[in-house]
Amino acid sequence: MAKIINVIGREIMDSRGNPTVEAEVHLEGGFNGMAAAPSGASTGSREALELRDGDKARYLGKGVLTAVANINGPIRDALMGKDATAQAELDQLMIDLDGTENKDKLGANAILAVSLAAAKAAAAFKGMPLYAHIAELNGTPGQFSMPVPMMNILNGGEHADNNVDIQEFMVQPVGAKTFREALRVGAEIFHSLKKVLQEKGLSTSVGDEGGFAPNLASNADALAMIKVAVEKAGYKLGEDVTLALDCAASEFYKDGQYDLTGEGKVFSANGFSDFLKSLTEEYPIASIEDGLDESDWEGWAYQTQIMGDKIQLVGDDLFVTNTKILKRGIDNNIANSILIKFNQIGSLTETLAAIRMAKEAGYTVVISHRSGETEDATIADLAVATSAGQIKTGSLCRSDRVAKYNQLLRIEEQLGEKAPYRGRSEIKGQA
């Protein structure tokens, strides 16, 4: 038995200079695991609660000492002597101990950090890589694939200080034969884009996720810049590389309308979906995330109806990695893909349940980072372990993003042909 003998919580810093929670789980025999909880900027209103102290005299109220105390107190007491390999039981213990719908007593950040640290400790106990252990927990032992990266090379919205409304403009190297090659393609395009921006006298400062954040006149201008960068890097847009957007539309949804201040335009729900569709007709956009507000289910139905057969429509704020909400979406034919973020739901077990539900319904899965990240690279292992098919973990800049890509390189090296890179076929509507 992988007996837990200690659980430790601490306050560390994330990539935006805000505190977050780190946990360690120690087992008999000297095995241990350590993990950190990420934090989002544009968050869905139904996400599990990230517990912050609210003491304005300390870290502007963003301290996490209460969550840390919950780890070092009640969570530690509940898990002492338990088997770290029994992940579902550990997670349920913490969920029951919290006793609330959205983990607002102990904090999803506290529960998640311990949940992931326990998984890492259990993997160490079993003498296997984390991805292999998670695959066993997922009921898919030995089944792996390398994810297609969604590389956020140009930022707007809440992730940048500019006048671009759409939050993320991404490239997906779908024509690559391996993950290593896909990463190289993305890196070359990133550097090409930097040169294109410099030549136009535009800023090459970067946003939270490492993408450039220039002031552009419109969202279409951002796509045009990326098109030039892809071609200058020597690749064919639509063939070697497809584009993806994260609109984060909840951020500019006001009074039932979509107010694109950067564009100087206001759209109805259907009007904004039509606007996005027009962009997909002009550029090879294969995936659109949060193309409407999380509460605009009627609008989502229309968007799915007009684009769902050809374009991957990803629910992030819409589904918040929550099986109850995802089931409603599946039953009502809303979207066709889900973004998976550990900290939206707050435990590894619940995350795996959401991935399984999505796959069983024929929805694609995109494993995602948050804008506030750490050096923790667990999402890389999760993507491979569940054969998710896609990963979204920022640009080719900032070590908090690159850490995940580097872990994927290591995993691909270890697994070789056992973890194929399937490219375009992983994206809904592109097979």
Swiss-Prot record:
MF (Gene Ontology): magnesium ion binding; phosphopyruvate hydratase activity
Active site residues according to the UniProt entry: 209, 341
Compartment(s): Cytoplasm; Secreted; Cell surface
Protein keywords: Cytoplasm, Glycolysis, Lyase, Magnesium, Metal-binding, Secreted
Binding-site list for Mg(2+): 246, 289, 316
Enzyme Commission number(s): 4.2.1.11
Signal peptide positions (record): none
Cofactors demanded by this protein: Mg(2+)
GO cellular component, one term: cell surface
SUPFAM superfamilies in UniProt: Enolase C-terminal domain-like, Enolase N-terminal domain-like
GO BP, one annotated term: glycolytic process
CDD domains hit by this protein: enolase
Cofactor remark from the record: Binds a second Mg(2+) ion via substrate during catalysis.
One Pfam family this sequence matches: Enolase_C
Classification via Gene3D superfamilies: Enolase-like C-terminal domain, Enolase-like, N-terminal domain
Pathway assigned in UniProt: Carbohydrate degradation; glycolysis; pyruvate from D-glyceraldehyde 3-phosphate: step 4/5
Chemical reaction(s) catalysed: (2R)-2-phosphoglycerate = phosphoenolpyruvate + H2O
HAMAP family, A to Z: Enolase
Function: Catalyzes the reversible conversion of 2-phosphoglycerate (2-PG) into phosphoenolpyruvate (PEP). It is essential for the degradation of carbohydrates via glycolysis.
Cross-referenced PANTHER family: ENOLASE (PTHR11902:SF1)
Protein name listed in UniProt: Enolase
Biological source species: Shewanella woodyi (strain ATCC 51908 / MS32)
